[in-house]
Amino acid sequence: MTTPVLEVKDLHVAYGKVEALHGASITVGAGQIVTVIGPNGAGKSTMLNAIAGALGANASAQGAVLLRGADVKAWPVEERVAQGMSLVPESRDLFTTMSVEDNLLLGSYTRYKRGEKDWRAQLDVVYDLFPRLRERRTQAAGTMSGGERQMVAVGRALMARPALLMLDEPSLGLAPLIVKEIFRIIVRLKETGVAILLVEQNARAALQAADYAYVLETGDVVMEGPAAQLANDPKVIETYLGLNKKSA
C-alpha cells in the first residue's frame, strides 16, 4: 500500500481551554486534491496551521501529523518546509515593496540554506505556470492585483518544490474570472504529482476541482467522501452550494 503524502490522525487543537478541533483525521495522497469545506469558524484554518506547525503560542495540539510516513509533530516550521510541506496562508503575506521575483526566491530559502545548487531553477517551473509573473517579475508585489498577488503567493510556495501544498482560501476576495483561473492552475498542479490540501469557502469551486472532500463543522469532521459524491449530497447542496433540494 502506498504511503500517503499527508496523514492526520485524531488531531485536537485548543486555544487555552477552548478546543477548536475535536479529533480530526484526514488523508492526502500524491497527485490528489483534497478539500476541506465548512462555514466560518469551523476550524479549517486552524487545521492547516496545526499541520504546518504555525499555531500561535497560546495554542496546543495533540494527535499525529505524518508527512510521507514521518511524524512531524516535533519539527519546527522550517524543517517541515525543508521536508516537503508548503502553506499558502489566507493573508498571502507578500513583501509588498519587493519585486515579484524576489518574493518568489524567498520561497526557496530553505533549499538555498541546505546548499542545493539548483535552488533558483524552480523559477522556470513557476513562470511556466504563471506567465504573467514572468512578464512582471521586476514589478513591486504591492502594485499587483489581488489575483496576481495570489499567483505570487502560490508560486512562492512552489519554489520549495513541495510534496504537499496547502492552500488556505485561495479564492478569497477575487473576482469570479480570476477564481476560475486560480482553480485551473490548482488542477494543473495536481498533474505534476504534488499532493494538494485545499481549504475553501467556495464549496462549489472546491468540489469541482477536488478528488476527495471533508466537511468540517465546529471542529468536527461530519462528512467525507469523493468530491463528486458530496457535490450531489442533499445536505451539502442545501447548506454549502446555496441550492434547495428541488432546484438541485
Segment roles from a protein language model:
Residues 2-248:
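Glycine-rich phosphate-binding loops of nucleotide-dependent enzymes
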